[in-house]
Amino acid sequence: MTIQEIRQYLTQFFDPVELVGEGDAVIAGPAKIESAARGEVSFIANEKYLRYLSLTSASLVIVHRSVDVSLYAGERSFLKVSDPYTAFVFVLQKFARPRTLAKPGVAPTAAIGGGVSLGEGVAVGEHAVIGDRCSIGAGTVIAPNAVIMHDVKIGEGCTIFPQVTIYDGTLIGDRVVIHAGSVIGADGFGFAPQPDGSYVKIPQMGVVEIGDDAEIGANATIDRATMGSTVIAKGVKVDNLVQVAHNCRIGEHTVIAAQAGISGSTIMGRGCMIGGQAGFAGHLELADRTHVAAQAGVSKSFLEPGTALRGYPAQPMREQLRHEAMLRHLGSMKEKIDRIDRELKEQGASRD
């Protein structure tokens, strides 16, 4: 693509897209600003990287429209937009090579159950298994060795990577991506304790529902509901190695980083951000746009939208930082208390 073609492409998403410099040069691909070479495109979205305006060898740099690039316009070209980070994401999408996980049609070694509906252009890879009465939407790719049990419905344009297991009754929307090794719809962790110390398994009779445009990372596990549905709403992004327990409801466009553990019946609002290794006690609720720091332990509900939480047990950010500051001074406070105690004892002894 030429620089001018990239500019024209970005006008679908931004207005204006200002070109500073030549537009005829051919761009072969994207690169990091630190290592970009001639013929490559990069971006700067953070002020601390502005020094690379003079250091980079990139032929094209995408910057914020407020950045003054006049000193460098003779060395390379610039595209000025309102959000250079997102603009570069769109450029990456343009240059990204699609993965070929399976060819359209059903591979010879795939096993397809009875009453299965396959939409136009569906691809089912080698040794994949699709159970009875499943419905797979147009353009969806089922990679080799994926297992889809009975009565599963998958929408259009989805990608199911190798070794994914989708249990019976799961409902998946359009354009959903589920990465390798993930398990969707396994039994929730439900056991009734008995007087003798043993446990009776509670049948897990619900399902998992995953909304449009969600993405599930590798080796994530999302358990089916005891009754009703475990819900991963539209646009949710779940990182690798995340556990979502039975009957959780994750609100639209929430993002959950790796190794977070979400106990049963947790309800998260829209647009929440959950840091890596955060833990949730279960049967609690988070309001919209709640931010939970990495390794926080959330043990109760927080119903004020936009709250930032950190620490164990998790508390609002300012409160937790204040407590941490107090803890840092415990040593000196103890010394002061010990000194005062000695002085009081000495004063008492002198009176005697």
Swiss-Prot record:
Transmembrane segments: none annotated. Belongs to the transferase hexapeptide repeat family. LpxD subfamily. Pfam families: Hexapep, LpxD. The gene is lpxD. It catalyses: a UDP-3-O-[(3R)-3-hydroxyacyl]-alpha-D-glucosamine + a (3R)-hydroxyacyl-[ACP] = a UDP-2-N,3-O-bis[(3R)-3-hydroxyacyl]-alpha-D-glucosamine + holo-[ACP] + H(+). It comes from Chlorobium luteolum (strain DSM 273 / BCRC 81028 / 2530). One of its GO terms (cellular component) is membrane. This is UDP-3-O-acylglucosamine N-acyltransferase. GO terms for molecular function: N-acyltransferase activity. Keywords: Acyltransferase, Lipid A biosynthesis, Lipid biosynthesis, Lipid metabolism, Repeat, Transferase. Catalyzes the N-acylation of UDP-3-O-acylglucosamine using 3-hydroxyacyl-ACP as the acyl donor. Is involved in the biosynthesis of lipid A, a phosphorylated glycolipid that anchors the lipopolysaccharide to the outer membrane of the cell.
